[in-house]
Amino acid sequence: MAGNTIGQLFRVTTFGESHGIALGCIVDGVPPGIPLTEEDLQHDLDRRRPGTSRYTTPRREPDRVKILSGVFEGRTTGTSIGLLIENTDQRSQDYGAIKELYRPGHADFTYDGKYGFRDYRGGGRSSARETAMRVAAGAIAKKYLDMKHGIKVRGYLAQMGDVVCELKDWQQVEQNPFFSPDVDKLDALDELMRALKKEGDSIGAKVAVMAENVPVGLGEPVFDRLDADLAHALMSINAVKGVEIGDGFAVVNQRGSEHRDEIRANGFQSNHAGGILGGISSGQTITANLAMKPTSSITVPGKTITRSGEEVEMITKGRHDPCVGIRAVPIAEAMMAIVLMDHLLRHRAQNADVHVDMPHG
């Protein structure tokens, strides 16, 4: 079956291609009475949209979202919310030369192998352009989580190449085009991007995302553990090749005496688990890291084949991001928010009558 939907009670279904007429999504499960306007969604869309700095793709899309249904007089009605974003800056002629080629590192080869037919313009459905609708839907979830439960979801660029950004100042994240919380690393990031542009190459990145004030109890063991669903959602983002929850792969070098999050009367003494124990939220901050591959859309010549099997050398033309991790921050926030809202609704549906006087954690 087509994998265009995520969530059970809070369900998001997206549609559209990179160079199609428009992108859209249907959001089901939003409780009624939530104040919601297009401007509520536009803030995060503006953070994600292309053409906003010299470090991202020059494709200039306004990404103005339209609410088609599910909202009346500024409040959600409880019915399906339809969202639409028109594509306005397609340059499909940039892709005519690759109609018969498989771009190395892209989904061209696998989409052809699966469907026997593909939209080669900008990658079609496989393009990260689709994530605009995830961000729009995620903005709804972020508003609900914050307004009703005080849950805040936010992320930042943790690393680009060898440049590591420390979490020094959250306010800085929105003040620079890199989403970096470390103002001391901005010059190094700028130098790296300039070098990549000169070389016609790209670089990978690590994006961090977290949720604060998440209550104890979210997650449905055993197959719908909260960390499993978060990993699924975050891995579904284009270019993500790895997801860590908490300390992630660093646990390989840790001892049990170090990794266990000891609990005292004043709460947990550490958070190596990333806010999730046994697949259920512990009440601590949920933390995750995403490893993002360097984009294969570069001007460095590469070897590939045509649909008929002929070996050729190609250079990718078009407008692309030298580091996809920069614009991935609002996408990661959206996917985490979508999962958390879905699990909040699922927890309420099954456990509404459960009241436990938990000690402070």
From Swiss-Prot:
- Superkingdom, according to UniProt? Bacteria
Give an example GO molecular function: FMN binding
As to how many cofactors bind and how, the note says: Reduced FMN (FMNH(2)).
Q: Which GO terms describe its biological process?
A: amino acid biosynthetic process; aromatic amino acid family biosynthetic process; chorismate biosynthetic process
Of the GO CC terms on this record, one is: cytosol
Annotated keywords:
Amino-acid biosynthesis, Aromatic amino acid biosynthesis, FAD, Flavoprotein, FMN, Lyase, NADP
**Positions with a binding annotation for NADP(+):** R48, R54
| Pfam hit, one | Chorismate_synt
- Report the EC code(s) recorded for this entry: 4.2.3.5
Catalysed reactions listed for this entry: 5-O-(1-carboxyvinyl)-3-phosphoshikimate = chorismate + phosphate
Q: Where are the residues of the annotated region Disordered?
A: 37-59
Residues where FMN binds: R125, S126, S127, N238, A239, G278, K293, P294, T295, S296, S297, R319
Could you list the residue ranges forming a coiled coil in this record?
none
Pathway where this protein functions = Metabolic intermediate biosynthesis; chorismate biosynthesis; chorismate from D-erythrose 4-phosphate and phosphoenolpyruvate: step 7/7
Residue ranges, compositional bias (Basic and acidic residues): 40-49
- What is its cofactor? FMNH2
Q: Which InterPro entries match?
A: Chorismate_synth, Chorismate_synth_AroC_sf, Chorismate_synthase_CS
Q: What class of enzyme is it?
A: lyase
Q: What's the stated role of this polypeptide?
A: This reaction introduces a second double bond into the aromatic ring system.
Q: How does it assemble?
A: Homotetramer.
Q: Which HAMAP family match?
A: Chorismate_synth (MF_00300)
Which family does the similarity line name?
Belongs to the chorismate synthase family.
Identify this protein by name.
Chorismate synthase
Q: Which organism is it from?
A: Erwinia tasmaniensis (strain DSM 17950 / CFBP 7177 / CIP 109463 / NCPPB 4357 / Et1/99)
